[in-house]
């Protein structure tokens, strides 16, 4: 039986590729997709979800737009990474269908309520929508199997010296998620910076030769440029968000540890930092499965294999 999932995302090049991977995988049943503000403004990320589903010919999947700003802060976006549209690079179709009239939280709650089995929530943007769901529907917590997030880091940040972007945008929401008591799986920068796509990998995807693999290659062409900056020390571009979907499909290519994670919401220098108790110093019981390593070649091979689904 396919694993039921809800995807909450803020497309974003890597979010878009995570959607491509999920919808090419019969092991997963994508029951709903919700959009969050983050990589771009809420209007643009919602539009990008609809554009991607139009491209992938999946207007059957319910879509709803989420919170327009973080729980307690003004919105920060990453247009320097993802461009004016949020998905700059390829020519994507205009949406062929409309989102649901309700909110992301309403669609998530309805999906959980109607599911015969617990649902995995995959969140590849800020945690605002998920936190709102958890706070407003405590009766549905038991319907959530786990929450798999792209966010955080044990060590270095990518938006501030201490903080990864998704967590920095809404640290209060992330803290709600980590302390919810629901199993959390964290794909942070420790693993996503190892899941780099090299120039040769982009050409491998392009050579698959179907319309979707071509779009993915063009998305990566644009995404690659930002990561050429010498300050990162990268060979390629880290493909953050697809690590969440890849872990659901092939957990054996990832190395994980069970640890307690908290989110700093007040720090002068460390706001948005995910504090990972790696050496069990707090006495707190682990609340997260933290990804720390990945078989990069296995990750690339999985993407290439699933892109052939669209032939």
UniProtKB/Swiss-Prot annotation:
InterPro entries, alphabetized: I/U_nuclsd_hydro_CS, Inosine/uridine_hydrolase_dom, IUNH, Pyrim_hydro_RihA, Ribo_hydro-like
PANTHER family according to UniProt: INOSINE-URIDINE PREFERRING NUCLEOSIDE HYDROLASE, URIDINE NUCLEOSIDASE
Gene3D superfamilies assigned to the protein according to its UniProt record, in alphabetical order: Ribonucleoside hydrolase-like
HAMAP family (alphabetical): Pyrim_hydro_RihA (MF_01431)
One term of GO molecular function: uridine nucleosidase activity
Active site, per annotation: 240
Native source organism of the sequence: Salmonella paratyphi B (strain ATCC BAA-1250 / SPB7)
Family assignment from sequence similarity: Belongs to the IUNH family. RihA subfamily.
Keyword terms of this UniProt record: Glycosidase, Hydrolase
Protein name: Pyrimidine-specific ribonucleoside hydrolase RihA
Any one GO cellular component localisation term in the record: cytosol
Gene assigned in the entry: rihA
EC annotation from Swiss-Prot or TrEMBL: 3.2.-.-
Pfam family, one: IU_nuc_hydro
The protein's role, per its UniProt record: Hydrolyzes cytidine or uridine to ribose and cytosine or uracil, respectively.
GO biological process: nucleobase-containing small molecule interconversion; purine nucleoside catabolic process; pyrimidine nucleobase metabolic process
């Amino acid at each position: 039986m396919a694993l039921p999932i809800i995807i909450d995302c803020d497309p974003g090049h890597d979010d878009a590729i995570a959607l491509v991977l999920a919808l090419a995988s019969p092991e997963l049943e994508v029951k709903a997709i919700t959009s969050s503000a983050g990589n771009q403004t809420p209007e643009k990320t919602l539009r990008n979800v609809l554009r991607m589903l139009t491209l992938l010919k999946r207007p059957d999947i319910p879509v709803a737009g989420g919170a327009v700003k973080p729980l307690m802060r003004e919105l920060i976006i990453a247009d320097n990474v993802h461009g004016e549209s949020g998905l700059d690079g390829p020519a994507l179709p205009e949406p062929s269908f409309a989102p649901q009239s309700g909110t992301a939280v309403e669609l998530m709650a309805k999906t959980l309520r109607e599911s015969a089995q617990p649902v995995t929530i995959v969140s590849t943007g800020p945690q605002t929508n998920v936190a709102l769901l958890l706070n407003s529907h405590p009766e549905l917590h038991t319907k959530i199997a786990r929450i798999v997030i792209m966010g955080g880091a044990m060590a270095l940040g990518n938006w501030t010296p201490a903080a990864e972007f998704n967590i920095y945008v809404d640290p209060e929401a992330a803290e709600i998620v980590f302390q919810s008591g629901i199993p959390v799986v964290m794909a942070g920068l420790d693993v996503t910076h190892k899941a780099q796509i090299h120039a040769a990998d982009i050409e491998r995807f392009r050579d698959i030769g179907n319309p979707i693999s071509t779009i993915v290659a063009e998305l990566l062409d644009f995404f690659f440029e930002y990561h050429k900056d010498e300050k990162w020390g990268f060979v390629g571009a880290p493909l953050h968000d697809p690590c969440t979907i890849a872990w659901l499909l092939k957990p054996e290519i990832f190395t994980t540890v069970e640890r307690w994670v908290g989110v700093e919401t007040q720090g002068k220098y460390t706001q948005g930092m995910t504090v990972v108790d790696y050496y069990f110093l707090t006495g707190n019981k682990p609340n997260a499965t933290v990804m720390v390593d990945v078989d990069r070649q296995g990750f690339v091979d999985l993407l290439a294999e699933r892109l052939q689904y669209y032939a």
